[in-house]
């Protein structure tokens, strides 16, 4: 297996609402399925695709039970400066997110905070001085 992550699918309660939230953050819808039986939204990001799909349908498709609780996964959005962490957290709050942890210095020498999207998915917004966020959005380990 080649080392690669192609798609992250978030199970959501209301795909239209979740889509509107990510569009309010500046993400651009790249496609999807929208018919009488299903609604899936796809956003192209550098190096991977983010999908939004009904939580129950995703659980069924994955062969697991939807417990509605935290699944032990946190998403991360790396930025170029500590100031950008605070700006992104403010943008997320304005779009409808809850701030779980405001921006603060970390034990590993960076600066990060966490917002929770409307469906309960935690997003860490982080500046790591040892990583590079390139102009095309890729993040690399230095």
Show the residue positions of the predicted features.
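Generic detector of contiguous secondary-structure segments
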Residues: 2, 31-42, 106-113
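Vicinal oxygen chelate
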Residues: 4-13, 41-43, 63-142
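Hydrophobic pocket/interface hotspot
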Residues: 18, 22, 85, 92
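Short, flexible, glycine-rich and Lys/Arg-enriched loop motifs at helix boundaries
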Residues: 56-68, 132-134
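Core segments of cupin and vicinal oxygen chelate
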Residues: 9-59
């Amino acid at each position: 297996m080649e080392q690669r992550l192609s798609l992250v699918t978030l199970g959501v309660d209301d795909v239209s609402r979740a889509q509107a939230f990510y569009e309010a953050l500046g993400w651009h819808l790249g496609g999807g399925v929208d018919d009488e039986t299903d609604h899936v939204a796809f956003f192209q990001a550098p190096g991977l695709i983010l999908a939004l799909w009904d939580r129950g349908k995703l659980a069924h498709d994955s062969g697991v039970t939807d417990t509605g609780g935290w699944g032990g996964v946190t998403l991360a959005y790396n930025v170029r400066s500590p100031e950008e962490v605070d700006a992104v957290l403010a943008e997320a709050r304005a779009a409808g997110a809850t701030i779980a942890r405001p921006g603060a210095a970390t034990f590993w020498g960076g600066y990060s905070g966490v917002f929770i999207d409307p469906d309960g998915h935690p997003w860490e917004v982080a500046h790591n001085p040892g990583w590079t966020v390139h102009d095309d959005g890729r993040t690399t380990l230095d």
